[in-house]
Amino acid sequence: MAAERGLPPIELHRLGRRPYVPVWQAMREFTDTRDADSPDQFWLVEHDPVFTQGQAGKAEHLLMPGDIPVVATDRGGQVTYHGPGQVVLYPLIDVRRGKLGVRELVSALEQAVIDLLAAHGVTARARPDAPGVYVGETKIASLGLRIRRGASFHGVALNVDGDLAPFQCINPCGHAGMAMTRLVDLVDDCPGCEAVALELAECLARQLGRRLTPMDTVPA
């Protein structure tokens, strides 16, 4: 857990279920127009089914997309899947103001997921060779960030109770044969996505040494 940084609270926005592209565009607009006084924000969302291809993505890792749309995006990393039953947390953080290194933010995101899973009795770990969070040899959370104008966007996606079949249509994050898992298969009493999303936001805030302020309005 990080020490309290003395920064203002992070605004917590719950977006519900949204298509990917409008949320991505809203993240970019927020990042491009924010200034030194703009609040940091966490966005919690579930996306409609979509494959997103990161800047390092290769076409050969997209095996059989079928009817699921493919979006070439500007985050780091390679291809992944988003869909209902998966909690996505986007940390829109002024990393310069917070004196936060990219590796530090990545580690905070991974540790937040690890802490959440530990609270439910699941042992998980990060891997130095493949960003994300793993339970044994299976992947439960994917991670991809972008830093622009000294601020972060994109984030982390945690599989809670969604359909994992679409992951078989890709090489997740560029790793052929990567097995995926989800929280509902690892615990006897799995919370719903909304509860897990709030837990994840709280875990990440603790890692960053920040407080959260829930917001009634959504930014996108």
UniProtKB/Swiss-Prot annotation:
Which PROSITE patterns does the UniProt record give?
A: BPL_LPL_CATALYTIC, LIPB
Q: What job does the chain carry out?
A: Catalyzes the transfer of endogenously produced octanoic acid from octanoyl-acyl-carrier-protein onto the lipoyl domains of lipoate-dependent enzymes. Lipoyl-ACP can also act as a substrate although octanoyl-ACP is likely to be the physiological substrate.
Q: Where does substrate bind?
A: 75-82, 142-144, 155-157
- Location(s) in or outside the cell: Cytoplasm
Q: What InterPro entries does this protein map onto?
A: aa-tRNA-synth_II/BPL/LPL, BPL_LPL_catalytic, Octanoyltransferase, Octanoyltransferase_CS
The catalytic activity, as recorded, is:
octanoyl-[ACP] + L-lysyl-[protein] = N(6)-octanoyl-L-lysyl-[protein] + holo-[ACP] + H(+)
Under Gene3D superfamilies, the record lists: Bira Bifunctional Protein, Domain 2
One of its GO biological process terms is: protein modification process
The record ties this protein, via NCBIfam families, to:
lipB, PRK14342.1
Active site (catalytic residues): 173 (acyl-thioester intermediate)
The alphabetized UniProt keywords are: Acyltransferase, Cytoplasm, Transferase
Query: Which parts of the sequence belong to the BPL/LPL catalytic domain?
Result: 36-212
Show the CDD domains listed in the entry.
LipB (cd16444)
| UniProt name for this protein | Octanoyltransferase
Q: Which domain of life is it from?
A: Bacteria
* Organism of provenance: Chromohalobacter salexigens (strain ATCC BAA-138 / DSM 3043 / CIP 106854 / NCIMB 13768 / 1H11)
Q: Where is this site: Lowers pKa of active site Cys?
A: 139
